[in-house]
A protein has these predicted regions:
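Thiol-based oxidoreductase modules, predominantly thioredoxin-like and allied folds used
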Residues: 106-119, 134-142
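Conserved helix-turn-beta segment immediately C-terminal to the redox Cys motif
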Residues: 74-75, 92-112, 129, 176, ...
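Active-site acidic short loop of glycosyltransferases
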Residues: 72-74, 104, 133-134, 151
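Thiol-/selenol-based redox modules, centered on thioredoxin-like
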Residues: 9, 159-189
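A short beta-strand-turn-helix
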Residues: 50, 55-76, 100
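N-terminal targeting signals for export/organelle localization
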Residues: 1-53, 189
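Conserved redox-active cysteine motifs that mediate thiol-disulfide chemistry
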Residues: 72, 80-97
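Short, internal strand/loop/helix patches
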Residues: 125-163
Length: 189
């Protein structure tokens, strides 16, 4: 009986060795027989364009939704601001003057970072009304635009051409001359 167990053990070891050897021979051959995957260069599309301005949703004073893409076909001056921000307030007169001059040819999106605590729709709209500004103001109540543009400091202004590409960015308070030259560059395209 002991002899039979010994033969059985040897037989099991030989069978396991045969399975391992067979697997080592067959599996690499199967991998070699896999068809080669063909790849080709894909032409750059609008979606792959790194300069394409991220789309987002914001709301006007009446709660109507707007998207950046709604203004495709027209250059856009996109400005992120808040009423508690000193540099934001300091650049507003130049932005208003530019809006008065170019508002028929360039869309102005004055996006207020309305987080609901340090800035509310009420505080922002009260500031705008008190100063008599007439440019369009949009409220980023869900912070969607701020996230899309990775806004970590304000003010910041983006100059977006009619095809939706970001052509220039200015972080911090934008001087009137820089605002003017960037708008002129957008209109020249």
């Amino acid at each position: 009986m002991e002899k039979m167990y010994r033969i059985l053990k040897i037989l099991i070891v030989v069978l396991l060795a045969a399975v391992i050897i067979a697997a080592a021979v067959v599996l690499p051959r199967q991998a070699e027989e896999q068809p080669e995957v063909q790849t080709e260069a894909v032409p750059q599309t609008e979606a792959a364009n790194e300069n394409l301005a991220p789309n987002f949703r914001v709301y006007d004073m009446d709660g109507k939704e707007y998207k950046l893409s709604d203004f495709r076909g027209k250059p856009v001056v996109l400005n992120f601001w808040a009423s508690w921000c000193g540099p934001c307030k300091a650049e507003m007169p130049d932005l208003e003057a530019a809006y008065q001059t170019y508002g028929d040819r360039v869309e102005f999106m004055m996006v207020n970072l309305t987080d609901g605590s340090s800035e509310t729709v009420e505080s922002a709209s009260s500031f705008i009304a008190g100063e008599g500004y007439t440019f369009p103001v949009y409220y980023d109540t869900g912070m969607e635009a701020a996230v899309a543009y990775r806004i970590y400091a304000i003010p910041v202004t983006y100059f977006i051409d009619a095809s939706g590409e970001v052509r220039a960015t200015h972080e911090g308070m934008i001087p009137g001359e820089a605002l003017e030259s960037n708008i002129q560059a957008l209109l020249a395209q």
